[in-house]
């Protein structure tokens, strides 16, 4: 594995990320959610894509793609491991979203190219990274109150907002992926909350990927 080459690719791609609001439809008609996981001891990469109507946030379509994992787990290079399955799921959607939430980092990455940014560039769609853990940078400790907010800073640059979406839950790291500003990323996530820790697009993507009860109930209703 030529990590030097991958690192150079990340730096080059990161320079093309658009950190300004460039939505083709504002407000969007459809918002997507994406989640990636691994099965069979990491041999299989699974990506779930969901499509929600906006502003109702009603689930209208989902796709799950499973492909052979193309590279090992290497911290800092996860997007190269995850994007092939994301692309496979994306290509199955009959309707593409106007805005995509990705479970993972956007520019809040040591080389400013998390999976939300990498995939957004790949398919040229506005994306937001919604991550559950810090990858780089520092932030002031948050109060325990829901809504507590702090900028994630690295080398004098704000990379994300750290936001406690729900009481007694760890905060989310919300960042520009591509074609969405940092402040707008936070605002869009806040508009897509329904009382859970995660915004509806990535909550549904996780539910579909993992076969959670909410998704099973939804399937039963559709029959």
From Swiss-Prot:
Keywords noted in UniProt: Cytoplasm, DNA damage, DNA repair, Endonuclease, Hydrolase, Magnesium, Metal-binding, Nuclease
Record-listed Mg(2+) binding positions: 35, 103
Superkingdom of this protein's organism: Bacteria
Residues with site note (Interaction with target DNA): 73
Top EC category: hydrolase
Reactions that this protein is recorded to catalyse: Endonucleolytic cleavage at apurinic or apyrimidinic sites to products with a 5'-phosphate
GO cellular component terms attached to this protein's record: cytoplasm
CDD domains noted in UniProt: Endonuclease_V (cd06559)
Main subcellular localisation: cytoplasm
Transmembrane segments annotated in the record for this chain: none
EC number: 3.1.21.7
Listed cofactors: Mg(2+)
Cellular location(s): Cytoplasm
GO BP terms in the entry: DNA repair
UniProt cross-references to InterPro entries, sorted A to Z: Endonuclease-V (IPR007581)
Its biological purpose: DNA repair enzyme involved in the repair of deaminated bases. Selectively cleaves double-stranded DNA at the second phosphodiester bond 3' to a deoxyinosine leaving behind the intact lesion on the nicked DNA.
Family in the record: Belongs to the endonuclease V family.
Name of the molecule in the record: Endonuclease V
Gene responsible for this protein: nfi
